[in-house]
Amino acid sequence: FTSALQLTTNNVRLCGQIVPIGSNLLFETSDTTFGIEICEDLWSTIPPSSSLALQGAEILFNMSADNEGIGKNNYLCSLISQQSARCIAGYVFSSCGFGESTTDVVFAGNGLIYENGSLLARSERFSMKEQLIISEIDVERIRAERRINTTFAANQANLGDKKAVSIATEFVNSKELTLTRKFNAHPFVPQGIELNEHCEEIFSIQVAGLAQRLVHT
């Protein structure tokens, strides 16, 4: 699936209603704003999600028909991680599953949820059963990160005439919300081999700074 380069209309009749169509739609709820792109939009030089994020989308969805190939999954995860980090947003990716595979084209049923570059949840690849993955995306953290990112604000000012269409909508929320995410009580202290890597990096940074000072002393 790819987005149309030029649409002859901004609206389409669907289920007896006239609804907007395009890659520039923002869906606003009382809690957050989200945008949608399709499949290879993510692979483009400037994905539609970039513009949507700059115009207020805090969560980005990608409905995909992404077939499998050797090494492709790692590249896909890298793309989603980078795009969610670059947009300072949550990114939810859902692709075709086993029921749509053939002998020539195979779909692994990739389901991925990222937040600002970090993986929150993923489905089991090549499962022969339907799957549902769930996670919470911290939209308040996303807003805070965007406020302190001067480059993000500068990009917002340079959007030009790329104007999104806002659509008021609402989520059907359950009365009880059970958190699935686990938060480290000591988030700034990594564990295992990562601790050694961070300590070595801190040491190298300090040494480089002191060495430069000694050169000019």
Model-found features: residue ranges?
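Enzyme catalytic cores with a strong preference for nitrogen-chemistry domains
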Residues: 1-217
